[in-house]
């Protein structure tokens, strides 16, 4: 019995060891699986979602002061915007971009910020922006915030502390000693964008501070790394709230030459009416477009990308405003900007431009932009004469052009209903393009219950308003919404682009894939024009079934009608979009089509 007991004890001991080893192995396997799952979850969390959502987007600029007044004070506000979110949903825009809403003394209508992380009381509260974001995201609408990094208000606590040389704030701005016997003369001839010296002497600090814009807008010193971190903290504050991206203001002015002893040279050809105090008098080689500016923008791109990865967010988009040369603007593509604003239809073209000039505006941008990037087209903004006033009678065709071209389209509020500038307001004060949105034909065009608004409502509001155009079969608003719907077609997302000068007055724009051609014909003259479709160089358009898809409000044929005999008549200042289906391709290079498809599938 003793030996039997020992035998069974030994057997039990061996089995226990085997079971223990198996348990240990199972635990190891479980641990391995847990580790793999944790790594997988970690990788999933460290991922930018929905990359490229912006590549074919329509961004809509909201000027908050003029969009919708919720409390009857005559000034638009955040609650007003929230109350009108359905408008964006109905039109189909991808994102709204809010002009500055930060706390500000309003010397430059919000572009002079005294607190980057608070809301100007005239627009509402932080809760109001939280509510706006919540409701916008419910309907799939993204919200872009204006970021003004070049300068602050002189009422910002940073500047007040810098004046007193308090700690790190001493060098938050660009301070220099004056020259001359009394040390009260500016150190050089640099002038402000708003004319006059860009240097202002501060009696308390006994030094000059630099300002590219108003003297109440001192420039920040980005050669101070603490200032760079401050701006990233501000970006994080808004990203934490759910902002989907930033439109970065006045980017070319972020840096100036470090050597302040150099004077800027006079331009070779200067308007005789200008003098040395005018900004347009000089070639701004020291106060604009410095290499460090591009590096700073790249650092912001790295920051938002890292934030999106760490928070498993959709790609955070950066749009940059730069009034500069084509080459300097295009360069931002290589330094982190998703959308370096293309202002060429504003700065390089107007109602007097011929077809060759319009074609060049398009081709020059397309030919210069890096492969794999997205083009963009801006027709108007809060600083320029409205599209409908710059191109009288032709606003429809310019919107059609913008929407047919590849890439991003940017709409300034009111363009979708054909708003124009208030005629009696001088264009150089910028107010003509900032009048209240025209919602209907009631008091103050439905913008406010108050008969007195911060700017007067345009007298034409009973004829041009959203309510009226929504109920009309043929209106600018109906055209606008149909164009946004049309942009969803594969051809307009991924098709190649061809521009053709059919005559001095007729421009053709073709978008094409292997199975479809979308053609836009624009008649810039006031006279009727006859267009032979064989001139487009497309056997598909001239031989395959071609139908009218959309026409400008002054086009005289109904959508859906087939084009017979390859001839189409365009009324004066009219435009039409045609769609042709079939296997034939245009005479453009098949290799170009192949590259277009590849870049659409594998964007850089």
Annotate each PLM feature.
Residues 46-236, 240, 253-323, 437:
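Acidic/aromatic-lined carbohydrate-recognition and catalytic surfaces
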Residues 259, 264-286, 295-315, 332-334, ...:
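Loop/helix patches that line or flank the sugar-binding groove of alpha-linked glycan CAZymes
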Residues 528-554:
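Beta-strand-rich binding/interaction modules
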Residues 153-163, 309-312, 317-351, 420-429:
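Substrate-binding cleft/loops of secretory-pathway carbohydrate-active enzymes
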